[in-house]
Each structure stands twice: as C-alpha cells, then as structure tokens.
C-alpha cells in the first residue's frame, strides 16, 4: 500500500508539472489576431499604341507654328479629352507611293483624359504625325479627329483602375478566450486533467475503505505472525 501511494503521488506530481509548463507555453506564445490591413491604391496609366494613329487622324492643325489645343467631348461616356501640341518645321512627305503637295507636322500631344463623375485625370503623352495641306494657306484641316479621341481616352480612363482593397481578418486558431486570457483548448485540457485526478483520488479512497477491515483484522489477530512475511514492507 505504501509503494502504491508513493507511485500515485509521483504520477500526480508529474501531471501537474506538465500542465503548468503547457499553460505557461500557451500563454507566452499566444498572439492576438491581426487587425484589418488597408491595401495600397494602384493607378496604371497605359502607354499609347506602338504603331500610333494613322496619318489621316489629326487634331486641329494650322499652317502657323503657334501652339495647338483641341478639345474633343465624347458622347458615349462624357469624357473630355484635351489635345495640346506645338507644330514644328514642315517637311515634304509621300503617301501611297505618290508624291503629293502636303507638308508633315509632328505634334507632341499631351493628352489629359478626365473621367466623368470622379474628376480623375490621367495623362498620356504620344508623338503623332499629322498632315496639313500646303495649298490652303491660313486654313484648318481636320481629318478623322473623332476616331483618335475615343481610342486614347479609352486607354486613359478604362485602364486607370483605382482599387483600395481591405484585406480580410486572418483567423487565429490560438486567439485568447474571454476567460483567464488562455486559449479555449488549454482550458478544456486542464479541466479534463483535474477531473482525472479527482477520479484517481476517489478510487484511492474506495480501495482504502475496502481494505480497512482487513487491516484491522491483521492488527487484532492474536495468532502469532511470521515476521518474514513483512520483511519487504518494513
């Protein structure tokens, strides 16, 4: 009986030591859940087409070298596209394998596309080669300017996406519970361990009560007992 009780006490002490170390480890390594993280805003401005618009697409060009400004208002999405450029020295050019009496004007277009409703402006810069007739002095020639404006505005407004992403909360499996600041699984484990210790203690009391009459009988027995029977217990 003495050896059995010593072993039970040692087992209970080891269990309590292990539980204490687990509690300290869990409370020390537990981290709070991350809060909402605000993402960044990405605005992309596409570059103009590599091939560029064809030579029959032009803004308002005159024979003078003064700055040129043309504003085109698109009826589809009410987006205003403003073309601003400056003409340079005219040079002869050919078209369709035939020399024609025209002069070429290179216009550096600073295109500003203003998105309807938001007021957001997207800038696109491209070098566009346009032609103006030299026979019409001090006059203006516009050829298919309406086809150039929608192409550039669609690149400047449709692809200029603005996204502000709010990342979702990352779930934390070891998030502290409301009671005692410990994870829930730790509290459950500790509760089951204490329940097991209570059952072991109750079983010990039952065995002690069961063996009590036998101990009293051995102590009150008048028959001479052989000391060698208790040699291992003393």
From Swiss-Prot:
Record: glycosylation sites: 36, 56, 77, 96, 101, 110, 127, 144, 159
Superkingdom to which the source organism belongs: Viruses
Disulfides per UniProt: none
Subcellular location(s) per record: Membrane
Chain spans, region Disordered: 29-62, 116-138
Topology relative to the membrane: Single-pass membrane protein
GO cellular component: membrane
Alphabetized UniProt keyword annotations: Glycoprotein, Late protein, Membrane, Signal, Transmembrane, Transmembrane helix
Transmembrane residue ranges: 187-207
Residues spanning the signal sequence: 1-28
Membership in a protein family: Belongs to the Epstein-Barr virus BDLF3 protein family.
UniProt protein name: Glycoprotein BDLF3
Phylogenetic lineage: Viruses, Duplodnaviria, Heunggongvirae, Peploviricota, Herviviricetes
């Amino acid at each position: 009986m003495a050896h059995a009780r010593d072993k039970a006490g040692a087992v209970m002490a080891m269990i309590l030591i292990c539980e204490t170390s687990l509690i300290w480890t869990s409370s020390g390594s537990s981290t709070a859940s991350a809060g909402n993280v605000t993402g960044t805003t990405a605005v992309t401005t596409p570059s103009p087409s590599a091939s560029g618009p064809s030579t029959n697409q032009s803004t308002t060009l005159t024979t003078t070298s003064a700055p040129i400004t043309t504003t085109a208002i698109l009826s589809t999405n009410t987006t205003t596209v403003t073309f601003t450029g400056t003409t340079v020295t005219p040079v002869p050019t050919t078209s369709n394998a035939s020399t024609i009496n025209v002069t070429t004007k290179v216009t550096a277009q600073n295109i500003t596309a203003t998105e309807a409703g938001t007021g957001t402006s997207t800038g696109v810069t491209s070098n566009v080669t346009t032609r103006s007739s030299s026979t019409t002095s001090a006059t203006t020639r516009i050829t298919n300017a309406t086809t150039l404006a929608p192409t550039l505005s669609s690149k400047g407004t449709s692809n200029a996406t603005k996204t502000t992403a709010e990342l979702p909360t990352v779930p934390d499996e070891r998030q502290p519970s409301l009671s005692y600041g410990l994870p829930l699984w730790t509290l459950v484990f500790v509760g089951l361990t204490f329940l097991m210790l209570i059952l072991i203690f109750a079983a010990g009391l039952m065995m002690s009560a069961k063996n009590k009459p036998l101990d009293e009988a051995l102590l009150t027995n008048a028959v001479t007992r052989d000391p060698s029977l208790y040699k291992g217990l003393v």
